[in-house]
C-alpha cells in the first residue's frame, strides 16, 4: 500500500495559494486567449491557459500531476518564446518572467506535494531557476537593440569629413557681423548656437580623456518654480561675458558667465491663464543693432530712451515680443510700444492660452521673424497661424504671411482678420543671412485629426518646410513631409543648414528631420531634394476616405523609423498585460504608417506625434561629417469620438469652461467645429500598470554619416531609473531606451552632450563609438537642449533642469553648469 504524505498546515496553505494564483492566471489567459484567437491573434494563450488552470486546480489539491502540467507549460513556452522573439531580450521578459518566477516557487514547494519530491531535487531545480533569474537580471544591464560602430562606416565618415572641411563653412557665413550668424568660438549666440541650427561647438578643452572629471561649476535657481504644467525647456545664450535665458513664465535673466550669478532680471508679468497645455520658453534671441541703425536712432537716444545697442528679443506665452537692453535688462523704448509688440493684433478673438510664443524668433537682415503656438485640439477655427516679420529696431510690422491671402503683405484690411485655423509654426526656424531666407517648419491646421474643411492653401503649406524671403515676406519654395496631415505630424524640429557633398562639390543644403523619423536633405536655395524622395502608396479609408492622400513622401537618404508593428511587438510586465495589449492591437485599425484615424474603433499611429524627431532636433558635426539624432519610438492609440458623445462627456474648448487638463496633447480634445473630438493615448499606455504596450526600446540615439546617410552606430538611449510599473521610479540603471524630449550638442573634441531622457541624467557620449563616458544626476528632468561655451579660458556645459509634464519627470528651476576642475590640465 502506498503511503501518502500529509504536508504541514503551513506547507498546505503555501501550495494551495500557489495553486490558486496559477489557476487564476490560467483562467485569465484562457478567457483572453480565446478572445485573441477569435481576433486572428496568437493561439498560445488559450491552450496555455487551459494547462495552467488544470495545474492550478491540481496543485491546490496537492497533486503531483499539477507540477507536471505546469512543467509542460514551461516546456511549451520556451520554444514559443524563441519562435516569436529570437534573441531579443526584452521580448522574453513578459513571456517568461512570471512563468519562471512561479516555477521557482513551485520548485521550493515540491516536498509539500501529495507524493513529495526529495528536498535535494527541489533545491537543485530551484537553484537552476535562481541562476536563470540572476543571469536574466544581469542581461538587463546589457543594451539590446542597437548597432555598434563599424570601422568601414567610420572610414566613410572620415572621407565625408575631409570633403566638408574643404568648404568655407558648414553654415552660411554672416554678412552683417551678427553673433547669431557667426558666433565667436567661445559663444552660443542662438538657440542652435547659430541660426544655422547645427548645435555644434568648436570648443575642445573638454575631451574624451578628461570628460570623466567634469564637476558642477555652479547652479542657478530661477525662482520661477514650476507646477506640474510647467517645464522651461530653455537653452541659454552666451554672448561675451553673459548668459541670457528665460523661465517658464517668460522672466528673462542675465547671468555672469563665470559664476552663474544673476546680473539682471525682467518679468513681463505673464498670467497663469495664458499658459497653454504646458509653459515652455525654449530660449531668447540676441540682436546687435548695426552702426547705421544706431545713427538713425540717435535722436531717440538723445531724448532719454535707451539705445539698446545690443538687445534680447523674447516671445511670451501671451503673444508679445519684448526687446530688452542686453546690458541692463531694461525695455528698449524704441521697439514697439515701450519695448513690446502684440503679435495678436489682426488675429481677431484670441482667448488666453490660445496664442503663445514658446520658441525664440529668428532674426534675419534686421527682421524678427516669429511664429507662435496655437493651442491644439480646441476648435477648427482657432486664431491664425500667420507668420510675422517685425523690424528688430523699431518693432514695426515689416510684413505678414497669411497663406490664404498672398496679396496681403501687412496688417489685414480694416474689419478683417488673418485667416483663422491655418497652420502655424510653433517651433524654431533656421535662417540664412546670405540668401535672406528663413526656413519655417510648419505645423498643421487646427483640428489636427479632421481635414475635410481645409483650404487648398492650407493643404499646400501644412506640415511643410517653407523658405520665406525676409525682404518681402513671400514664400520662395516649400517642401511637404505629410500630404493632408491627419496625424499631428507637424514639423517640430529646427532644420539644420549644412554644406552637403554631392558630385564632388559642397551644395548649400538644409537637413530636415520629421516626427515620422524621415531625414530629408534639400537644396536650401530651391527646396529640391539632393537625395531621392520616393512617393509610396499608403493606407486609405478612415472617416474621410476622400481626403486621404494616395502616397506620402519617404526619404531615400535616412530614416529613424523602425519596421511596422506586429502583434509580437506587444509588451507588458506579465503575460496578462501583454495579452491585453495584443487584444488591443488586434481590435484596432493598423495598416502601417499613415493608418487613417477612425471613429468606430481605435487606430494605431506609429510613430506617434512625439517622433521620430521633435523639437530637440538633431546636431551636426560639420568637421567629421556626422549627424547625431536622438529619437522616440512609440505609437499612439487614437480614437475619434463623435460630436454628440464628446458633448455628453463634457469635452469643450478651453475658453468654454473645459477647464485645464494639464495632460498630454490630444487626450480628450474637443475639436469643436468638426464632426469628431479626438482621444489620444500618447505612447499607448495601459491605465493600470502605466507601462507602454510596445516593447522597448522607446528611444534611441544614432550617429549618421552625413555624406551617405548610413548609420554609424545606434543605441538605446535612457535608463529605467525614472520608470517602472504603476508609475514607480525603479532606480535601476538599465539602458532600456526611454522616451526623450530635448536635443544634443556636439563638440570639436568628439563629444556628444545630451540629457532629454526620463532618468534625469546628463551624459557625455563618445561620438565615434556611442559609448557613454560620463554622466551626472540633475536636480530635475533634463528636457531641454544643452549648450556649451567658454569664458576666461574655461569651457562650460550648461543645461536647464526644468522637467516635463508629459514625460512625468520631476519639475524644477535649476540651471546647472559643469566644467573641469580648475587644476585639471
Predicted regions and their residues:
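Repeat-blade elements of multi-bladed beta-propeller folds
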Residues: 188-192, 230-249, 276-320, 353-379, ...
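Asp/Glu-centered strand-loop micro-motifs enriched in Gly/Pro and often flanked by an aromatic residue
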Residues: 195, 201-211, 216-244, 269-271, ...
Amino acid at each position: 500500500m502506498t503511503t501518502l504524505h500529509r504536508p504541514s498546515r503551513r506547507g498546505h496553505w503555501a501550495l494551495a495559494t500557489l495553486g490558486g494564483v496559477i489557476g487564476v492566471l490560467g483562467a485569465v489567459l484562457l478567457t483572453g486567449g480565446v478572445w485573441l484567437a477569435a481576433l486572428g491573434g496568437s493561439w498560445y494563450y488559450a491552450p496555455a491557459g487551459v494547462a495552467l488552470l488544470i495545474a492550478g486546480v491540481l496543485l491546490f489539491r496537492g497533486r503531483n500531476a499539477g507540477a507536471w502540467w505546469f512543467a509542460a507549460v514551461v516546456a511549451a513556452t520556451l520554444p514559443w518564446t524563441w519562435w516569436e522573439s529570437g534573441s531579443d531580450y526584452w521580448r522574453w521578459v513578459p513571456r517568461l518572467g512570471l512563468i519562471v518566477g512561479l516555477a521557482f516557487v513551485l520548485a521550493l514547494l515540491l516536498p509539500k506535494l501529495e507524493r513529495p519530491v526529495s528536498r535535494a531535487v527541489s533545491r537543485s531545480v530551484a537553484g537552476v531557476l535562481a541562476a536563470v533569474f540572476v543571469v536574466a537580471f544581469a542581461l538587463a544591464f546589457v543594451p539590446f537593440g542597437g548597432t555598434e560602430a563599424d570601422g568601414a562606416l567610420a572610414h566613410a565618415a572620415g572621407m565625408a569629413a575631409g570633403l566638408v572641411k574643404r568648404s568655407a563653412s558648414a553654415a552660411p557665413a554672416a554678412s552683417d557681423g551678427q553673433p547669431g550668424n557667426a558666433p565667436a568660438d567661445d559663444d552660443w549666440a542662438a538657440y542652435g548656437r547659430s541660426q544655422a541650427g547645427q548645435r555644434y561647438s568648436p570648443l575642445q578643452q573638454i575631451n574624451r580623456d578628461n570628460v570623466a572629471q567634469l564637476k558642477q561649476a555652479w547652479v542657478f535657481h530661477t525662482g520661477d518654480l514650476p507646477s506640474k504644467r510647467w517645464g522651461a525647456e530653455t537653452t541659454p545664450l552666451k554672448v561675451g561675458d553673459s548668459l541670457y535665458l528665460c523661465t517658464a513664465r517668460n522672466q528673462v535673466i542675465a547671468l555672469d558667465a563665470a559664476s552663474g550669478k544673476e546680473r539682471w532680471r525682467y518679468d513681463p508679468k505673464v498670467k497663469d491663464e495664458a499658459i497653454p497645455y504646458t509653459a515652455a520658453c525654449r530660449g531668447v534671441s540676441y540682436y546687435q543693432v548695426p552702426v547705421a541703425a544706431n545713427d538713425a536712432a540717435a535722436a531717440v537716444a538723445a531724448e532719454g530712451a535707451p539705445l539698446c545697442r545690443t538687445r534680447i528679443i523674447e516671445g511670451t506665452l501671451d503673444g508679445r515680443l519684448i526687446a530688452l537692453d542686453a546690458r541692463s535688462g531694461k525695455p528698449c523704448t524704441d521697439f514697439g510700444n515701450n519695448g513690446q509688440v502684440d503679435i495678436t493684433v489682426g488675429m481677431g478673438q484670441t482667448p488666453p492660452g490660445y496664442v503663445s510664443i514658446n520658441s525664440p524668433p529668428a532674426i534675419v537682415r534686421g527682421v524678427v521673424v516669429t511664429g507662435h503656438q496655437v493651442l491644439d485640439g480646441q476648435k477648427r477655427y482657432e486664431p491664425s497661424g500667420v507668420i510675422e516679420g517685425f523690424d528688430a529696431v523699431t518693432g514695426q510690422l515689416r510684413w505678414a504671411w497669411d497663406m490664404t491671402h498672398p496679396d496681403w503683405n501687412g496688417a489685414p484690411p480694416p474689419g478683417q482678420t488673418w485667416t483663422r485655423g491655418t497652420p502655424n509654426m510653433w517651433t524654431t526656424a533656421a535662417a540664412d543671412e546670405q540668401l535672406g531666407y528663413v526656413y519655417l517648419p510648419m505645423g498643421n491646421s487646427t483640428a489636427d485629426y479632421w481635414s475635410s474643411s481645409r483650404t487648398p492653401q492650407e493643404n499646400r503649406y501644412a506640415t511643410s518646410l517653407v523658405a520665406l524671403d525676409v525682404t518681402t515676406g513671400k514664400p520662395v519654395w516649400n517642401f511637404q513631409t505629410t500630404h493632408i496631415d491627419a496625424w499631428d505630424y507637424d514639423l517640430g524640429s529646427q532644420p539644420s543648414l549644412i554644406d552637403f557633398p554631392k558630385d564632388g562639390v559642397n551644395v548649400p543644403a538644409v537637413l530636415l528631420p520629421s516626427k515620422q523619423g524621415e531625414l530629408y536633405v534639400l537644396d536650401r536655395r530651391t527646396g529640391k531634394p539632393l537625395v531621392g524622395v520616393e512617393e509610396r502608396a499608403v493606407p486609405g479609408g478612415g472617416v474621410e476616405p476622400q481626403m486621404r492622400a494616395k502616397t506620402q513622401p519617404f526619404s531615400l537618404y535616412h530614416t529613424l523609423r523602425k519596421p511596422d508593428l506586429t502583434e509580437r511587438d506587444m509588451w507588458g510586465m506579465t503575460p496578462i498585460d501583454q495579452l491585453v495589449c495584443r487584444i488591443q492591437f488586434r481590435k484596432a485599425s493598423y495598416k502601417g504608417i499613415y493608418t487613417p484615424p477612425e471613429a468606430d474603433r481605435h487606430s494605431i499611429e506609429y510613430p506617434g506625434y512625439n517622433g521620430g524627431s521633435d523639437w530637440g532636433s538633431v546636431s551636426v558635426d560639420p568637421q567629421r561629417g556626422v549627424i547625431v539624432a536622438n529619437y522616440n519610438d512609440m505609437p499612439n492609440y487614437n480614437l475619434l469620438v463623435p460630436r454628440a458623445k464628446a458633448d455628453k462627456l463634457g469635452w469643450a474648448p478651453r475658453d468654454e469652461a473645459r477647464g485645464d487638463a494639464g495632460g498630454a496633447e490630444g487626450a480628450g480634445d474637443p475639436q469643436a467645429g468638426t464632426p469628431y473630438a479626438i482621444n489620444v493615448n500618447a505612447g499607448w499606455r495601459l491605465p493600470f500598470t502605466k507601462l507602454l504596450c510596445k516593447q522597448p526600446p522607446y528611444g534611441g540615439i544614432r550617429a549618421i554619416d552625413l555624406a551617405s546617410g548610413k548609420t554609424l552606430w545606434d543605441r538605446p538611449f535612457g535608463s529605467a531609473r525614472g520608470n517602472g510599473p504603476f508609475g514607480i521610479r525603479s532606480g535601476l540603471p538599465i539602458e532600456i531606451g526611454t522616451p526623450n524630449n530635448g536635443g544634443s550638442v556636439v563638440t570639436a573634441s568628439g563629444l556628444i552632450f545630451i540629457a532629454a531622457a526620463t532618468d534625469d541624467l546628463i551624459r557625455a557620449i563618445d561620438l565615434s563609438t556611442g559609448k557613454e563616458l560620463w554622466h551626472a544626476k540633475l536636480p530635475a528632468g533634463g528636457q531641454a537642449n544643452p549648450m556649451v561655451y567658454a569664458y576666461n579660458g574655461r569651457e562650460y556645459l550648461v543645461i536647464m533642469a526644468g522637467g516635463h509634464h508629459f514625460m512625468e519627470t520631476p519639475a524644477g528651476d535649476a540651471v546647472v553648469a559643469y566644467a573641469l576642475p580648475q587644476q585639471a590640465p
